[in-house]
A protein has these predicted regions:
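N-terminal export signals
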Residues: 1-14
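N-terminal Rossmann NAD(P)H-binding glycine-rich loop of SDR-like oxidoreductase domains
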Residues: 24-45
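Conserved glycine-rich Rossmann-like NAD(P)H-binding loop of the short-chain dehydrogenase/reductase
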Residues: 48-54
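Conserved Rossmann-fold NAD(P)-dependent oxidoreductase catalytic core, especially the SDR/UDP-sugar
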Residues: 100-154, 161-162, 169
Length: 352
């Protein structure tokens, strides 16, 4: 498959057509990772957007966007009495915050779209998780952060559906990647591949990987609002199943990388080197065994589209070059240069 085979090529070259009817949209958030892409696309589609934030972070947003200042922890006065066609909540992972916003807005807005996560399916003990799968509503292990996150998101979903019923919509994205990433997870690969040399390739070539470009997520969320769709949707890409053995060469070609790959498929060895993940790759064992197998069938039928990996990788690399030098010098990558060098040396010594 070619580099653009996992989706539509050149998705950002044509401006989006405007919606048949512009809507009044409220975005809870709007200045993080998803928010700016969401706001830009909504405005380009002809919608009028208001964002509600704490006012602590700046973002390049289109002219005409209304900004309200407040806090999800009870300081919602700026929202009182305001009416919107829909609200998009992309800033909550605590159910008590969602309860406050849904109770305040349930008689002021038409539809409430909540940004959840495929993390609600944790532990990933069965393949092919779709939206009908039961999710945990209570944690069983206080030391398991992944479980706590998934349970919290599931409880947030419940708050939305209890307050809005058929006017509630939930999206469950997998790992979100692309320009503007606030996590420093995926940017590792574009910059590392562009640097060249011997590249540690973690895991088995056959390990499945999933991701969603933040712009594809944002466009789908706006589409759900425009189509007035209820229900829950796994927002997972690419369109078909991909493996790490396909992802790395394709990403490497996208940046014109000249390096070579040294595959380390021994999970025990990687664990000893404290290499457990490098998005979109995660170590597929134990509670993460089927982490990368969520179904996207329902979302695709509802209009979810996918831009090619080449575009995502190139745009992420270009954006990474614009972030502040202090962050680039001390990134929060899951594989650090010294760590990679030590692991490669130890792997070669083990196999000598």
């Amino acid at each position: 498959m070619g580099l653009l085979g996992c989706g539509r090529g050149g998705a950002t070259t044509t401006p989006p057509a405007t919606a048949a009817r512009g809507r009044e949209l409220l975005v809870l958030g709007g200045t993080g990772f998803i928010g700016p892409h969401l706001v830009r696309h909504a405005v380009a589609r002809g919608h009028r957007v208001t964002i509600f934030t704490r006012g602590r972070r700046e973002a390049a947003l289109p002219a005409g966007v209304t900004r309200l200042i407040g806090d999800r922890d009870g300081k919602l006065e700026a929202l009182q009495g305001r009416r919107f066609d829909a609200v998009i909540d992309d800033s909550a992972s605590k159910p008590e915050r969602v309860r406050l916003s849904t109770q305040l807005l349930k008689d002021q807005v038409g539809r409430y779209l909540f940004t959840s996560s495929t993390g609600v399916y944790y532990p990933y003990l069965q393949p092919g998780a779709d939206e009908r799968r039961a999710v945990r509503m209570a944690a069983t292990d206080p030391e398991d952060g992944s479980e706590a996150y998934g349970v919290a998101k599931a409880q947030c979903e419940r708050e939305v559906m209890q307050a809005f019923g058929a006017r509630g919509t939930v999206v469950r994205p997998t790992y979100i990647i692309g320009p503007g990433d606030t996590t420093d997870r995926f940017p590792y690969w574009p910059q590392r591949l562009a640097r060249g040399g011997e590249v540690l390739a973690p895991g088995r070539r056959t390990d499945p990987v999933q991701w969603i470009d933040v712009r594809d997520l944002a466009e789908f969320m706006v589409r759900l609002i425009e189509d007035d769709r209820a229900g829950t949707y796994n927002v997972v890409g690419p369109r078909r199943a991909w493996t790490m053995g396909e992802f790395l060469p394709a990403a490497n070609a996208a940046v014109g990388g000249t390096g070579s790959f040294t595959w380390i498929d021994d999970y025990e060895f990687l664990s000893a080197q404290e290499i457990f993940d490098s998005v979109p790759w995660v170590m597929l064992k134990d509670n993460d065994l089927w982490h990368m197998s969520s179904s996207n069938t329902k979302a695709v039928a509802a209009g979810l589209g996918f831009r090619g990996l080449e575009e995502t990788v190139r745009d992420t690399l270009a954006w990474w070059g614009t972030v502040e030098a202090a962050r680039r010098d001390r990134p929060g990558f899951s594989i650090q240069p010294e760590q990679e060098a030590r692991a490669l040396a130890a792997w070669k010594a083990l196999r000598a």
